[in-house]
């Protein structure tokens, strides 16, 4: 699903490839996809005040991330926590939050 670009100085997640106006194919960065999604969200709000945008975006990204990591580690929470760089207790709380326990 996600690829990492081959730039050694910065491992950036990509969500696919896009063709530029001049026909060049380049990676589509996850960061850019999130930026577009949030921009579209605000456009749809039509001037209304938005609340809890941080939590909304975090949930949209965090839940599939946890799901993929748990699949990759075959449910091993210690390995998953190490891969994510978080405490195992924190991982357990997040899994419970998204109903993945």
Swiss-Prot record:
One Pfam family name is HTH_8
A GO term for molecular function: sequence-specific DNA binding
DNA bind region:
77-96
Q: Where is the signal peptide?
A: none
Show the SUPFAM superfamilies listed in the entry: Homeodomain-like (SSF46689)
- What does the subunit comment say? Homodimer.
Role according to the record: Activates ribosomal RNA transcription. Plays a direct role in upstream activation of rRNA promoters.
The record's family statement is: Belongs to the transcriptional regulatory Fis family.
* NCBIfam families for the chain: PRK00430.1
Provide the protein name: DNA-binding protein Fis
Query: In the UniProt record, what gene is named as encoding this protein?
Result: fis
């Amino acid at each position: 699903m996600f690829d990492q670009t081959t730039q050694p100085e910065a491992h950036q997640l990509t969500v696919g490839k896009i063709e530029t106006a001049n026909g060049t194919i380049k990676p589509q960065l996850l960061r850019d996809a999130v930026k577009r999604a949030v921009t579209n969200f605000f456009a749809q709000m039509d001037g209304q005040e938005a609340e809890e945008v941080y939590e909304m975006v975090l949930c949209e990204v965090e839940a599939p991330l946890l799901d993929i990591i748990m699949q990759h580690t075959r449910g091993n929470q210690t390995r998953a926590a190490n891969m994510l760089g978080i405490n195992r207790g924190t991982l357990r709380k997040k899994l419970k939050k998204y109903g993945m326990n």
